[in-house]
Amino acid sequence: MPSFDIVSEIDNQEVRNAVENAQRELETRFDFRGVEASFEWTSKETTLSAEADFQLQQMLDILRNKLIKRNVDPDTMEVGDPEHSGKTFSQKITFLEGIDAPTAKKLVKLIKDSKLKVQASIQGDQVRVTGKKRDDLQAVMALVREGKLGQPFQFNNFRD
């Protein structure tokens, strides 16, 4: 019986490269000359720090562009609120990985409401879809790509 898994993963190395490229661009941009602004990367989150709130927005746009160039979907970013401390503003960005329980339930409901002859089951941070026909599974893939559930999904472990 054919099956596949729906997962939500990001390549941490590509995200790190995008953050480093954004930092390099920040150092060469004219509007950031003489300004203390930086990107700080940790394993699951990035911290943006700058002297003004509008500079954080510019930095966020730079980071989005760099992520797109590195083939990382910017929808994986969860942007926190800007925090002001002293003379600097900082903003934390976390990268979503894995499918949380409410999103998995929405995904299963979306698949069941489509009336396709497939079964969807939640297995930890992924959703397994099984069906008798390969065409049904491909229809589910198209349905999930079209559905706007707030995060990007990948399909792996396709078995016949």
UniProtKB/Swiss-Prot annotation:
GO terms for molecular function: nucleotide binding. One of its GO terms (cellular component) is cytosol. Keywords: Nucleotide-binding. The keyword Nucleus does not apply. It comes from the Bacteria. The keyword Protein biosynthesis does not apply. PANTHER family: UPF0234 PROTEIN YAJQ (PTHR30476:SF0). Belongs to the YajQ family. HAMAP family: YajQ (MF_00632). Nucleotide-binding protein. This is Nucleotide-binding protein TERTU_3542.
